[in-house]
Amino acid sequence: MKIKILGTRGKIEPQAQDHVRHTGFLIDERILVDVGEAEYMDNRPGAVVFTHFHPDHAFFVPEKEKFTPDIPLFGPEAHELIPELQMISGKFEVEGYTFTPIPVIHALKLKSLGYIIEKDQKRLFITGDVAWIEKSNLAKIPPLDLVITEASFINKGGRINRKRDKIFGHTGVPDLIRLLSPHAKKVAFCHYGNWFFEKTPEESKEQIKALEQEVELIPAHDGMELEI
């Protein structure tokens, strides 16, 4: 399985070369997970799967453009701009790949899903943006070849907001390593926040690499290709 990380910029202004584009992952040039930039559709994917509908994962949301490519479209909940969206209620198959949804806590008003993507005995987990993953959902995760997750905040705890009994926001890179490393051989990071650009990208990537212990940590750049 070949994975191209199309963009690594979070919901911030562009500040460095190689970290300009928003979120998108191209699987074997066949399936697109998230469409943070309109140009990603130039890859002519056979299907699109959304983790959630924030604008940096769904480019058409700010301008309220209809998103109507003539291919299968999947997401965690209905959206007025995607009339043909298939709502995900459990494991499904598309283009020969098996997707297992993992509920993820991220937004206050939007539902979010990560996905375990399987083919030919290889397993990839794309988390989307993460405030937290419940223990019961972590328990559903099998051994993985690769995780791709976010790096909005380098500090432990990230930035978590609370409203009544709900949390939302982004947890920190150290927390994600602790949550995900028991399941994976490698963890790749993208969706960088402002912290990443306070130094040079090379220095910030070294900050991530310095947290490496038993699991390989991979700070990504726009267009990075990984294979499992």
Language-model segments: residues:
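Conserved beta-strand hairpin/beta-sheet module of binuclear metal-dependent hydrolase folds
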Residues: 1-43, 111-128, 146
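Metallo-beta-lactamase
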Residues: 2-5, 70-121, 217-226
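Cap/insert and terminal regions of metallo-dependent hydrolase folds
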Residues: 134-224
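Short amphipathic alpha-helix with an adjacent loop that forms part of the alpha/beta core around
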Residues: 39-44, 91-96, 136-142
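Divalent metal-coordination and catalytic microenvironments
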Residues: 3, 25, 52, 99, ...
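Acidic/histidine-rich helix-loop elements
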Residues: 13-19, 82, 159-168
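Active-site metal-binding loops of divalent metal-dependent hydrolases
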Residues: 8-10, 30, 35-38, 53, ...
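Active-site metal-binding motif and surrounding structural segment of the metallo-beta-lactamase
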Residues: 30, 35-76, 143-148
